[in-house]
Structures are given as C-alpha cells and as structure tokens.
Amino acid sequence: MLLLELKKTNQTLETIHFIGIGGVGMSGIAEILYNLGYKVQGSDLVENYNTKRLESYGIKIFLGHAEQNITNVSYVVISSAINPKNPEIKEALERKIPIIRRADMLAELMRLKCSVAVSGSHGKTTTTSLVACLFEAAGLCPTVINGGIINNKLTNAYLGSSNYLIAEADESDATFIHIPSTIAIITNIDPEHLDYYRDFETLIGAFRSFITNLPFYGFAVCCIDHKIVRKLVDEITERKIVTYGIDSEDAHIIAFNINTDIASSTFDVKISLPNVLGTTIIEKITIPTPGRHNILNSLAAIAVGIELDFGIKAIKNGFNNFKGVKRRFTKVAEYNNASIIDDYAHHPEEIKATLATAKNIANKQNGKVIAIFQPHRYSRMQYLFDDFMLCFADADILYITDIYAAGENPIEGITGRSLVDKITKRKHHDKANFLAELDDAVGVIIDNAASGDMIIMMGAGNISSFANELDGRLSSSGFSCHTVV
C-alpha cells in the first residue's frame, strides 16, 4: 500500500521500527516519516548525532539490538548494512512482521513526488545539498533526504511543502535502480561495492538502468569528464541527457576561469544546451567549499536549475546560501597555524580529490600536506588495494591507521600495516608510516604541524569523532588548539 493511501485512511497508524536508525540514510527516512505523522522508533548500537537529533523530536531510540525492542511494532525497516543474524530481524521473521528495505521505503516516499535522485561513486551528498539549495532559492521548498548533515539545516533530511523530493540514491546494492525518479544525476562511476556487484561491468550496467528507467519526460544529468560516464552517455539514446564537465569541451555545461582557496571556489559557466540557439555565460559563481570536484558537483546542480528554468539569479543566490556539508573538507581546528580538516574520503578517487585540493591550498600558503587516513572495511581494501597504494601522492607526510571494520570480519593479509609496507616497498611514497593507534595522531600533529600546513584526517570510520575532539586532546597534552567548528 502506498504511504499516501495509508495516510488517507482514518485508522490508527502503526509503529515503524528502524534497525540501525542512527545510520545517515536510515535516520533521514525515519525523520521524514515522523514529520509526515507516522509513529517511528528505532535501535542502534551506539548513540550518535543522528540518534540524539531524533530523540530530541520525541522518537524512541533503543541503544543495542534486542528482541524486545520490536514489541508492538507493525513494520521493520532495514538497510543492506544490517546483519541478517540481527536479533530484531530474527524476531521479526519469527512473528511474521513485514521487513522493508530502506530503498523500498525511500521509493515509496519518492513515488508521491517529482523526484531528483543523485547517484555516483563520489560526490552524491554534496551534489544533493547543492541541488536542494537551488530549489529553495527558486522559491520551491523540496523534501530532502541526504547522505550527510547539511550545514544549512543541521540535519540530513527535512520535509518540504512543494511537490519535489531530492534524494541521495545509494548504489551500493543496486536498489537505486528501482527508485522512481524523474531526474537522475550521475557524478562519476568508479570500482566500488564490488563485494556486491562482483565485477565492474555489472556496476556500470546498474547505472545504465538508473538512466533508462527514467520516464520518457524525465532527464539525466551526467559528468562526461569521467570516461566511464561518457561511454555510458554515448551508448544511451532513449533518454534525454544533459552533460557537464570542466575538461570536456563538448559538454553542455562547462566551468572555466576557476579559482579556489581554503574556504571557497569561484568560476564562470558556459551553457550550450541541445536544441537551444546560442550560448549563455554565467560569471563569478562562488561556492563556500574548495576543490575541483566540488565545482563539478555544482555544475550538476546548475544543469538541473537550467533545465527547470530557475533563472541565473536563483542559481547564484542558491550557491550563496549554501553552507556546505559536514565531513566534506570541514575545517574543525587550528594548531600552530596549521588547519585540521575532517573529510569523509575513503575511496582512492575521493582521497586523490581531497589531497589535490589540500595540496593546492598548502602550496599557496607555503605549507605541506599531512594526511592521516583510516581505511574503512576489509573488503574495500582487498578489492582496491593497488589503487590505495597509488592515491596518496599529494601528501607530503602520510600516516595510515589499521582498518575500521564496520562490522566485517578481518581478511588475512589485508591490514593498514600491510598497505604501508607495500607503499614503502614499491616506493610509491617515501614518507608513509603506520599509526598503530588513532590516539597517536596527537603526537603526529604536535611533531609535524607548522604554519600553512593542511592536516587532513580522512576516512568513513571513527576518525571523524577523533578529529572533532582534537582541541581537548591537544589541550590535555599541554598544547593550545583553536576549535573552528
């Protein structure tokens, strides 16, 4: 039954329970359902920003997973990250409580709206946030379900009043191809989630379906600077596709005259749409976040805005109002006039982009780049080991911790130390070091940080919490640290 149909009935709404409600994707859907008037509760192993936020709304949160948590619930929502042996899943199966995948619940929400789905291996969260800002500047108020905390809203999801919904579409388990979107964005396609897809061609095929499943009146927005995306665009003839890029002269939307610093990026845009005579130039667009990759993300948002006739003024205002996304090159502190950056980069391509941005800024400040990386998941490290060996070139000094398991079992020979050993042995980096304990990063910063340096703390695990606690850790060691966030 569609949620809208259920909403129309006068029956008492039954309780929806989220297993792993603190996850960024799960918490967003839970918040939207709660704001729509549904009874929502959930469980997670530990308290975090998302669980605290949901609790502040009055949503019941259980810490820990247990059979009794799903007493008196009518539906259970899970994501692909939840272990099938979870006691709440086992209890739901025993009691024949319907178990709904997160992607299916998202699809139900999107089915009621004109939806924009943002996918790609990297850049989804920032792009989703940028698209949302442009919609708001155009006088629309979209519902947004994002994969990260939007600084403008201090949440990853919010209920709007218009008929538009903008969502980050997670490609990790192919469920994104079933999302009923009207507009689809593909930022890039790289080898990722191969533990699920098994090979790269299958992953590419999923993105092909993501576009071809659009209704005939919809359109896709694709970055053809990325060669795999370009090839895909060339192969698809049955759907309208708007392209963008920086290096691709044949793209419909191109950025040029690019300038970037630690706090922002400024650029001009040339727009040459198919079946539209002439070229439009938008001068001096500014976004409050650095990096070439973020300019590309902005171009995707511009493509949507142009196609929906938002107007140049609304596009510029939307970017002016954008305040970034947490954990996307977020400056959290300063020590000894060096900037400490918290970043979500956990894939080799993301690491390259983050370090390239840091290197560009450090060079302007006569500083160096100190990278502290916490690998995430044994399976990712195993599939992309060779790529991880080659992605740290822009770090002047490199420290790698052991792997954050994220619930996975160890894989023999796949460790943070083995990565450092291979990097050193093959001479891919002459200053690569293994960091046995994350706590040792305090000493690394004290010993190495100098004025103008960029200290990049990267990963999808608990390194973010560590980065945000550095002021206290350094102070307790007798050193002064200025907190930025």
Swiss-Prot record:
Record keywords, A-Z: ATP-binding, Cell cycle, Cell division, Cell shape, Cell wall biogenesis/degradation, Cytoplasm, Ligase, Nucleotide-binding, Peptidoglycan synthesis
GO CC term (a single one): cytoplasm
Catalytic activity reported: UDP-N-acetyl-alpha-D-muramate + L-alanine + ATP = UDP-N-acetyl-alpha-D-muramoyl-L-alanine + ADP + phosphate + H(+)
Pathway(s) served: Cell wall biogenesis; peptidoglycan biosynthesis
One protein family per Pfam: Mur_ligase_C
EC number: 6.3.2.8
InterPro entries named among the record's database cross-references: Mur-like_cat_sf, Mur_ligase_C, Mur_ligase_C_dom_sf, Mur_ligase_cen, Mur_ligase_N, MurCDEF_pg_biosynth, UDP-N-AcMur_Ala_ligase_MurC
One Gene Ontology MF term: ATP binding
Compartments in which it is found: Cytoplasm
UniProt superkingdom: Bacteria
GO biological processes: cell division; cell wall organization; peptidoglycan biosynthetic process; regulation of cell shape
Positions annotated to bind ATP: G120, S121, H122, G123, K124, T125, T126
Protein family per UniProt: Belongs to the MurCDEF family.
Function of the protein: Cell wall formation.
Protein name per its UniProtKB record: UDP-N-acetylmuramate--L-alanine ligase
